Amino acid sequence: MRRELMKMKINVDKSLIKAVKTGKVIIGANRTVDAAENGSAKMVVLASNCPADIKKKVQETNVPVLEYEGTSVELGPVCGKPFTIAAMAILDAGESDILAATA
């Protein structure tokens, strides 16, 4: 079972990398909430340690939410960024299959 979880996490990580490189994403809690509220986000990715108020605001919208198992410290480098990412919105997945993660 643990191996299955590791494989799944690796696939999510690869999908996130591909979405960042080939699609259009918004990084940052406030901008992510705005994208979710105005309907431009196709999916929101929240780090496991994302602040509760941000989670609540996003979950009040109809946008699918992917709760990333890692922390914001881990999510940043996965996306190729040298900073933490607590929340990000996927506007266009590009060549990534990340949108299937919540299907």
Curated annotation (Swiss-Prot):
Pfam families: Ribosomal_L7Ae (PF01248)
PROSITE patterns associated with the record: RIBOSOMAL_L30E_2
A molecular function GO annotation: RNA binding
Alphabetized UniProt keyword annotations: Ribonucleoprotein, Ribosomal protein
Family matches, as InterPro entries: Ribosomal_eL30, Ribosomal_eL30-like, Ribosomal_eL30-like_sf, Ribosomal_eL30_CS, Ribosomal_eL8/eL30/eS12/Gad45
A Gene Ontology term for the protein's cellular component: cytosolic large ribosomal subunit
Biological-process GO terms, alphabetical: translation
Taxonomy, superkingdom: Archaea
Keyword Ribosomal protein: yes
HAMAP family noted in UniProt: Ribosomal_eL30 (MF_00481)
Family: Belongs to the eukaryotic ribosomal protein eL30 family.
Listed name of the protein: Large ribosomal subunit protein eL30
Protein encoded by which gene: rpl30e
